[in-house]
């Protein structure tokens, strides 16, 4: 079937819109779909997403499409950019409308709610084995990407041809560098765990612990991410790249991160509901914390930072008490014998 668009993006929030703008700025005809018809009508009229990316005009190659069937019929390349807790339900909606030659990539960062499963497992459960799958991950703030500021990400998938095609679609010498990666599991995991650690970094700064504590938390958070990744068969080297260290540093150190700002509010004494309300958008790390904690427990992987953040978010522990417990842990070598 012939494409009338180069790619369809599902999800018209800040990140989905930013990726659609970036693709269209490359000269690729891009369709953007969202679940709210009123919001989509506003985007079409304004030629801008004033709610999430005010003042950034849509390129001519970006078209708004409120009809999911038409959006999915237009292209075999489908980029899903929705919160992790609705990822499965969006795929369920899309399934009967997908073309037989469809190829599915997502930029959603997270795990399945309650179970902590990777999104590739959710996608396979919903869609079966017939479609190539891929994931985009890396240090990307939506506003900077949409503005065309230099950014780098990684892509990995089940089909090398699809991965290479995505690199060609996304890569732009002026705005976006894209690295191919063969670690499908590692890229998915990095995007979820970094959200958890970013909440911890925000809490540390909110308490007033300073740069030393923040840096220690990021470093040990990377250790936890790598430990969990290796238990799932991921390549440890992945976590020194864009989807690991890169995304972790970005999210933990810049207040554009909702997860970091959420942690800051908690560290300054806000309760969970008040802190979420202050952000005003989805804080992926709130759910990710429970998902990552569940996964680590199931695999028997020690993740003390994640465990303390879980206790703050879901068991009412104060951030100060969580910090005290981490600091009072048994002394151990930084590089334990293998």
UniProtKB/Swiss-Prot annotation:
Active site per the UniProt annotation = 194 (proton acceptor)
Q: Do you know which NCBIfam families this protein is assigned to?
A: PRK00094.1-1 (NF000939), PRK00094.1-2 (NF000940), PRK00094.1-4 (NF000942)
Q: Where in the cell is it found?
A: Cytoplasm
UniProt-listed GO biological process terms: carbohydrate metabolic process; glycerol-3-phosphate biosynthetic process; glycerol-3-phosphate catabolic process; glycerophospholipid biosynthetic process
Q: Which residues bind NADPH?
A: 14-15, 35, 109, 142, 258, 282, 284
User: One Pfam family for this entry, by name?
Assistant: NAD_Gly3P_dh_N
Please give the Gene Ontology molecular function terms for this protein.
Answer: glycerol-3-phosphate dehydrogenase [NAD(P)+] activity; NAD binding
Catalytic reaction annotation: sn-glycerol 3-phosphate + NAD(+) = dihydroxyacetone phosphate + NADH + H(+); sn-glycerol 3-phosphate + NADP(+) = dihydroxyacetone phosphate + NADPH + H(+)
Q: Which Gene3D superfamilies match?
A: N-(1-d-carboxylethyl)-l-norvaline Dehydrogenase, domain 2 (1.10.1040.10), NAD(P)-binding Rossmann-like Domain (3.40.50.720)
Q: Can you name a GO cellular component term?
A: cytosol
Top-rank taxon of the source lineage equals Bacteria
Q: What is its EC number?
A: 1.1.1.94
Q: Know the name of this protein? A: Glycerol-3-phosphate dehydrogenase [NAD(P)+]
Residues reported in the UniProt entry to bind sn-glycerol 3-phosphate: 109, 138, 140, 194, 247, 257-259
Q: Does the keyword Iron apply?
A: no
* Function noted in UniProt: Catalyzes the reduction of the glycolytic intermediate dihydroxyacetone phosphate (DHAP) to sn-glycerol 3-phosphate (G3P), the key precursor for phospholipid synthesis.
Q: In which pathway does it act?
A: Membrane lipid metabolism; glycerophospholipid metabolism
User: Where does it mainly reside?
Assistant: cytoplasm
Identify the InterPro entries for this entry.
Answer: 6-PGluconate_DH-like_C_sf (IPR008927), 6PGD_dom2 (IPR013328), G3P_DH_NAD-dep (IPR006168), G3P_DH_NAD-dep_C (IPR006109), G3P_DH_NAD-dep_N (IPR011128), NAD(P)-bd_dom_sf (IPR036291)
- HAMAP family in UniProt: NAD_Glyc3P_dehydrog
Which controlled-vocabulary keywords does the entry list? Answer: Cytoplasm, Lipid biosynthesis, Lipid metabolism, NAD, NADP, Nucleotide-binding, Oxidoreductase, Phospholipid biosynthesis, Phospholipid metabolism
- SUPFAM superfamilies documented for this protein: 6-phosphogluconate dehydrogenase C-terminal domain-like (SSF48179), NAD(P)-binding Rossmann-fold domains (SSF51735)
State the family it belongs to.
Belongs to the NAD-dependent glycerol-3-phosphate dehydrogenase family.
The record's top EC class is oxidoreductase
């Amino acid at each position: 079937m012939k494409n009338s668009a180069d790619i369809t993006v599902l999800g018209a929030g800040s990140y989905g819109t930013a990726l659609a703008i970036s693709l269209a700025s490359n000269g690729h005809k891009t369709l953007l779909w969202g679940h709210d018809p009123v919001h989509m009508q506003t985007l079409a009229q304004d030629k801008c997403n004033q709610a999430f990316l005010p003042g950034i005009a849509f390129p001519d190659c970006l078209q708004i499409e409120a009809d999911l069937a038409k959006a999915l019929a237009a292209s075999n390349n489908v980029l899903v950019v929705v919160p992790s807790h609705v990822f499965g339900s969006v795929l369920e909606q899309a399934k009967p409308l997908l073309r037989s030659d469809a190829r599915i990539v997502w930029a959603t960062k997270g795990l399945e709610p309650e179970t902590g499963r990777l999104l590739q497992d959710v996608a396979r459960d919903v869609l079966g084995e017939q479609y190539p799958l891929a994931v985009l991950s890396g240090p990307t703030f939506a506003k900077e990407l949409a503005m065309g500021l230099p950014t780098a990400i990684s892509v990995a998938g089940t089909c090398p041809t699809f991965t290479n095609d995505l690199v060609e679609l996304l890569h732009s010498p002026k705005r976006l560098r894209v690295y191919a990666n063969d670690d499908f599991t590692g890229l998915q995991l990095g995007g979820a765990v970094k959200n958890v650690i970013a909440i911890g970094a925000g809490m540390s700064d909110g308490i007033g612990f300073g740069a030393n504590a923040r840096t220690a938390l990021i470093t040990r958070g990377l250790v936890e991410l790598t430990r969990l990744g290796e238990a799932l068969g991921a390549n440890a080297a992945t976590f020194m790249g864009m989807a690991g260290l890169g995304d972790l540093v970005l999210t933990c150190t810049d207040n554009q991160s909702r997860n970091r700002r959420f942690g800051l509010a908690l560290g300054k004494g806000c309760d969970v509901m008040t802190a979420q309300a202050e952000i005003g958008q989805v804080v992926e790390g709130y759910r990710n914390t429970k998902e990552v904690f569940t996964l680590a427990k199931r695999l028997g992987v020690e993740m003390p930072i994640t465990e303390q953040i879980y206790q703050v978010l879901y068991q009412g522990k104060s951030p100060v008490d969580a910090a005290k417990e981490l600091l009072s842990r048994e002394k151990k070598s930084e590089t334990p014998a293998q």
